[in-house]
Each structure stands twice: as structure tokens, then as C-alpha cells.
């Protein structure tokens, strides 16, 4: 695998049985990762990673504490994309800042059965196409691909500024009993809260 040599960094899997328990990436390709079949049990930080990931068939049981399937910008020749055309994919995410299916570009789902459990089931920076198949997010069937990038909650607003100042004191009493025309001080302005997006 060499990131500066486009013909390299491809992974193609046509079938087989795979069981992995690793600390980093289970299946990693710099350019294209294509899987046409097989049985996969993967426990990893990122179970499947590449620039363009295409899954046509297979059975996947993925457990991850970072990204279950991650399309990242590893090659300049492809737009980061997760394309799923078939298969049965079960993804279980650990708690924390994790994503079931994460794409720095697009997600295309044309078929298959996908079940994702976790705080963030899908996260993508580009567009999502749901043309066929079945998707479950935390046990609930959905009719469109959610996006954690668009659904994050904003943080709490900032505290207001100081309260207004006290009014000014009146002028000194003049001889003859009348009080001078000292003007009250203007009240101070309250500061505006700051909304922080989460």
C-alpha cells in the first residue's frame, strides 16, 4: 500500500470467513475496498476503512469504538464514498464520539439490510442516496438516511453581561433650597449570550 501510487492500495474480497480482533483498522485500503461476499466478524477501532468502499454482498458483524465503516480521503483519485448494494450488515458502536457509517463524502445505499446501534448511526459530509434496502437505526426502521452532522445539539448560551449601573446622584443643594439638576446615570447594557454549536 502506497498513498502516492494510485494503482496500489486496492482491496478486493470475493468470499471467505474472516474473524478479526485488532486495535486499529480491520480492513484498510487506501483507494478502493470492494467486498462481493463472505462472512466477517470484526472487532476494531475502525472495522472497514478506505476512500471508496463498495459492499455488494456478505454478512458483517462489526463492533467498533471509532467508526464501523469509514470512507476517508486517502486517495486523490476518488471521492470518499460508502456504497452498499447488498448484504447483511450489523454494526454495534461503543459509547462516545463514534459513528456507525462515516463518510467524508457521500453515502449510497441501493440494497441490503443494515442495522446500526450507537449514538451516531450515520455521519456524512456530502450527500446521501437511499435507493433500496432496509435500514435500522437503534432498532427503528427508517425511510431516509439520518445525518449526525446536521443533527448535533447546540451548546448552552453564554452568560449575560453585568447589570445596569446605578443612576447618578443629584446635584448639591443650592442656597435658597433648590436642588441642582444633576442627571441620573444611564443604565449599563446587559451582555448578549453566545450560542455555541455542538
What is each PLM-predicted segment?
Residues 1-198:
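A composition-driven surface/loop motif
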Amino acid at each position: 500500500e502506497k498513498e502516492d501510487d494510485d494503482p496500489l492500495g486496492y482491496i478486493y474480497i470475493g468470499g471467505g470467513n474472516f474473524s478479526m480482533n485488532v486495535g486499529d483498522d480491520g480492513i484498510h485500503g487506501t483507494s478502493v475496498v470492494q467486498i462481493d461476499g463472505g462472512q466477517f466478524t470484526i472487532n476494531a477501532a475502525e472495522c472497514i476503512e478506505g476512500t471508496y468502499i463498495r459492499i455488494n454482498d456478505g454478512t458483517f458483524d462489526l463492533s467498533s469504538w471509532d467508526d464501523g465503516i469509514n470512507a476517508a480521503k486517502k486517495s486523490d483519485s476518488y471521492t470518499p464514498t460508502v456504497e452498499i448494494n447488498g448484504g447483511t450488515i450489523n454494526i454495534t458502536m461503543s459509547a462516545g464520539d463514534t459513528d456507525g457509517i462515516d463518510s467524508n463524502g457521500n453515502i449510497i445505499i441501493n440494497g441490503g439490510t443494515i442495522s446500526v446501534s450507537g449514538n451516531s448511526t450515520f455521519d456524512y459530509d456530502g450527500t446521501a442516496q437511499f435507493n433500496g434496502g432496509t435500514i435500522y437505526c437503534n432498532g427503528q426502521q427508517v425511510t431516509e438516511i439520518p445525518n449526525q452532522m446536521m443533527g448535533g445539539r447546540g451548546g448552552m448560551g453564554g452568560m449575560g453581561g453585568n447589570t445596569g449601573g446605578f443612576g447618578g446622584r443629584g446635584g448639591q443643594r443650592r442656597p435658597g433650597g433648590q436642588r441642582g439638576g444633576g442627571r441620573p446615570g444611564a443604565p449599563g447594557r446587559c451582555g448578549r449570550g453566545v450560542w455555541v454549536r455542538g
